[in-house]
Design a protein with these regions (language model features):
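Conserved redox-active cysteine motifs that mediate thiol-disulfide chemistry
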Residues: 31-44
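Chalcogenol-based redox active-site neighborhoods
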Residues: 2-5, 72-73, 98-99
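Short pre-active-site segment immediately N-terminal to redox-active cysteine/selenocysteine motifs
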Residues: 25, 32-35, 77
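N-terminal leader/targeting and pre-domain segments
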Residues: 2-27, 103-112
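Non-catalytic, surface beta->alpha helical segment in thiol-disulfide oxidoreductase systems
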Residues: 85-112
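Thiol-based oxidoreductase modules, predominantly thioredoxin-like and allied folds used
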Residues: 11-12, 31, 46-50, 54-68
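Short hydrophobic/charged patches on amphipathic alpha-helices used for structural packing
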Residues: 18-19, 67-70
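Structural micro-motif
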Residues: 73-82
Length: 112
């Protein structure tokens, strides 16, 4: 039996949820939206990225449904990634450019 790698999707992320899901260990938040073509481009690679970085918890955050948190975290473009370690932000890949699998993996590796 093989493992299925599928990050949890959160439609509306609240401040309390953000604190809860990021308080322990490494947490990767991917901000995206259903209408976003660059998010759809990256989506097929996310299970493999998640498997390669299995020490982290991955969450897909709907940027439109979580607009208050997105504004607070200054998420200007999607897809964007914000990484936490034990409740503290340790890195971000936030811009409006299309991201490739290699770019995301290199970014995540750079945080170790």
């Amino acid at each position: 039996m093989h493992e299925v790698w599928k990050m949890e999707k959160i439609k509306e992320l609240t401040e309390d949820q953000l604190k809860e899901i990021t308080k322990e260990g490494r947490t990767v938040l991917e901000f995206s939206a259903d209408w976003c073509p660059d998010c759809k481009f990256l989506a097929p690679f996310m299970p493999e990225i998640e498997k390669d970085f299995s020490d982290a918890k991955f969450y897909e955050i709907d940027r439109d449904g979580s607009i208050d948190i997105a504004k607070k975290l200054i998420i200007m473009g999607i897809p964007s990634f914000v990484v936490y370690q034990d409740g503290k932000e340790i890195g971000r890949l936030v811009n409006k450019d299309r991201k490739t699998k290699d770019e995301v993996e290199n970014f995540l590796r750079s945080l170790d």
